[in-house]
Amino acid sequence: MSDVLPARFLTPVDLAELLGVPVETVYQWRRKRTGPRGFRVGRHLRYDPQDVRAWIEQQMTVGIA
């Protein structure tokens, strides 16, 4: 997984492309607080690749249970 995620903060478009989902899904996750933790830089939404990795691993674990 570390080879897949870039070393920079991700935009919502980056996250959507990485996960293969529409950008609107990323925004819905944010509104519902079900997606990876994001933060604002001024008006811009960003995601830390480490938080995204942790969220993906959590989703994989939830899917198993």
What are these regions (language model features)?
Residues M1-Q28, Q58:
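Polyanion-binding surface elements
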Residues T11-P12, V21, V41, L45, ...:
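Hydrophobic aliphatic residue packing
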Residues V13, P36, G63-I64:
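Serine/threonine-rich, low-complexity intrinsically disordered segments
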Residues L18-R46:
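Major-groove DNA-recognition helix of helix-turn-helix-type DNA-binding domains
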Residues Q50-A65:
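A short, Lys/Arg-enriched interface patch at domain edges and termini
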